[in-house]
Amino acid sequence: MNIYGLYENYQTIQEKRYVVVFESEKSTLKRYSRKDGTGVSIGSHTLSDEQVKILVGLNVDIIIAFDKDVSQNEVRKECEKFYGIRNFYYIYDKWGILDKKESPADRPNKQYEFMLKYKIKYDETEHKELLKWLKEKQKQNI
């Protein structure tokens, strides 16, 4: 699997020192049309091992900005792939800005920038929340 928009946005990503990872190519195009060349897309809400290697190799902060219908714990599972390797963040709409299937990129610049400003760092606390969720999920499957 490739990373859509990486070639076109590589220079801006290096200058800004961060990359925003979207699900849909449409989101990368939408942000680019708004003069924001920091976005790339992976075509789903699951990062492949190859995509992880490519993103880590950029040597910049990584921010996940998946659609609202992806749960916070599902986003945390993707963040876990970078835990302890890179500064990693995610956008989670706790304000009700997004509609059910909307991406942060679908919102006007002011709302997008607000959500980006209040991104959540995937740190030890977030890691523990994921482990707790996985444990509860495992209990339910027994």
Residue ranges of predicted features:
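Phosphate-handling DNA/RNA-contact segment within nucleic-acid enzymes
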Residues: 1-58
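TOPRIM fold recognition
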Residues: 33-142
